[in-house]
Amino acid sequence: MKRVLITGANSFVGVNVEKWLLQTPDEFIVETVDTMNEAWKKADFAKYDVVFHVAGIAHVDPKPKMAPLYYKVNRDLTIEIAKWAKKHGVKQFIFMSSKIVYHASKSLKGDVITENTKPHPNDFYGDSKLQAENGLRKLESSSFKVALLRPCMIYGLGNKGNLPRLAWLATKTPIFPAWHNKRSMIHVYNLAELVRQVILRELSGIFLSLIHI
């Protein structure tokens, strides 16, 4: 039996991972906590085996004035929660990062991202995620495993990201140029199963999809 705490109580990924894990109640006890106003510090981290950290700012706002907030939430809060988890005996910390740590594609040229691709973020959203990853790696030890998830575009019922916008646009303007544009996606339930396997197998390291964007 694994006891899991999910940060980001109402997030798209958090809600769906919780539902997925609870389909096997003999394997998991799952609880959630909000990260607003340090509410997470009231949770008893000592009773959990795993923290799945989903809370963060997920979409890019290009305004430079937003950069400090991204670093505060995506980097500083992540590392603070991980330190708290380690201090209280949590054995595994799973961080919801993003393929954006490689770069935000701004051209029609296709780039293939593999496990050998080196991160090179070109905006503060990606950089805040990468800096969080680097901070988490410094905390890793034999008794505190760190798993970093770098998924591609996530879709599924209830998603408010880019794909629903594109689908809506297609219904209004069903004419697309002759571009051979490819982009990998992952259904939220497939992502949830990845999280499930990472927990059950007590894995650490970096996990991503092979991406053609």
Model regions: which residues?
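Glycine-rich "substrate-gating" loop/helix at the edge of Rossmann-like oxidoreductase active sites
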Residues: C152-N159, A178-Y189
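Glycine/proline-rich active-site loop of Rossmann-fold NAD(P)-dependent oxidoreductases
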Residues: L130, F144, Y155-R165, Q197-L208
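N-terminal Rossmann NAD(P)H-binding glycine-rich loop of SDR-like oxidoreductase domains
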Residues: V4-W20
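Short alpha-helix in the Rossmann-fold core of NAD(P)-dependent oxidoreductases
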Residues: Y71-T78, I94, S128-K129, S184
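Conserved Rossmann-fold NAD(P)-dependent oxidoreductase catalytic core, especially the SDR/UDP-sugar
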Residues: I79-F124, A147
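Catalytic helix-loop patch of NAD(P)-dependent Rossmann-fold dehydrogenases
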Residues: K72, S107-I154, I175-A178
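NAD(P)H-binding glycine-rich loop region in Rossmannoid oxidoreductase-like domains
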Residues: W40-D76, E80, W84-K87, V101-A104
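A conserved pocket-lining segment of Rossmann-fold NAD(P)-dependent short-chain dehydrogenase/reductase
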Residues: P62-K63, W168-I186, Q197-V198, E202, ...
